[in-house]
Amino acid sequence: MSVETSTDAAGAGETRPLVAVLGGGRFGQALVRAAARTGEVVLWSRREQSDLPEGVRVTAELEEAAAAELILFAVPSRYAESVLSEVGAHLDGRHLLVHVSRGLIDDELQTMSHVLRRVTPCRRVGVLAGPISVDVLTNASPGAGVVGSEFPEVVDAVRGAIGGPTLRIYGNEDLRGVELAAALTGLLLLSMGFAQRVGFGPATIGAVGTRGVAEARRIGRALGAKPATFAGLACFGDLLAAASGSDRPEIELGRALAEGMTPKAAMLKAGGNIEGVEVARRVSEFGDRRGIRTPLADVIAEMVKGELTAADGVRKLMARDVGRE
């Protein structure tokens, strides 16, 4: 039974509170555009911004962003703690803090919500995940996403900020499960990308995808996540959307590796830092320590280190002993 729930967004005539977005990258800008359709937005960014919708105020001062109750955190994981330490001085228990990270913080697979609660006084936190692309947010294309949070008011706030007739926002109380599902989907997309470019057919790609979800579920179960979460939007839904045709950087990285590029060149072609690469290494090592089978993560980690070609990687996966599904 699905654990994801949805209700209608706020009525068109209602005025919602100010929303803040931290981070002016592509996804942060897309969040700004989506939120600007429903009310006022303040964007904190260290880079200059242009061509933003009316009702958007850009600031370089985190204190100004803290005027909003709902804060959408779209800062890359490697900069997250320093930004959170600074903004945390201006936050308190009334704030709702929701991140969009697809990364894992350390070798014990801690998620971003752990950092949010450790570095700031916020306790009502959440994650926005699922097949929500820049296109869906920017152009109001039909789509759906999920907010993982133990607090219904967090889900309601995000739904009121970016939800609407074309974007359904579901809720899932399994916060850590949604975070893990989002992070692990990144490494599944890497594997699907190189399988596509090597020339394997739909059957192989389907096998890689479905067994990848099973691998993600094993990791999640070991960390207390609900198995059903991995069948929802944050994992299977995101994977299906990307496999149906996507410009996701993880897919592009997998394709570039399959073309014989060095890991460094492949990363540059795909758009620089991709969190799925570090996720693969951490998951592979975590599996070794815990005795959990992680064949996809193992292969991807070897490929990124240049120890395995894409074709040999897929063959290695397909040559594994089979058992019950």
Segment roles from a protein language model:
Residues 2, 13, 189-193, 221-325:
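NAD(P)-dependent Rossmann-like dehydrogenase/reductase catalytic/cofactor-binding core
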Residues 2-60, 66:
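NAD(P)+-binding Rossmann beta1-loop-alpha1 motif at the extreme N-terminus of oxidoreductases
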Residues 48-54, 106-108, 155:
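Short, charged/polar "capping" segments at the starts of alpha-helices
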Residues 68, 90, 115-123, 142-229:
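Internal alpha-helical scaffold of NAD(P)-dependent oxidoreductase catalytic cores
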Residues 99, 124-129, 169-173, 231-232, ...:
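General beta-strand structural signal in soluble alpha/beta enzymes
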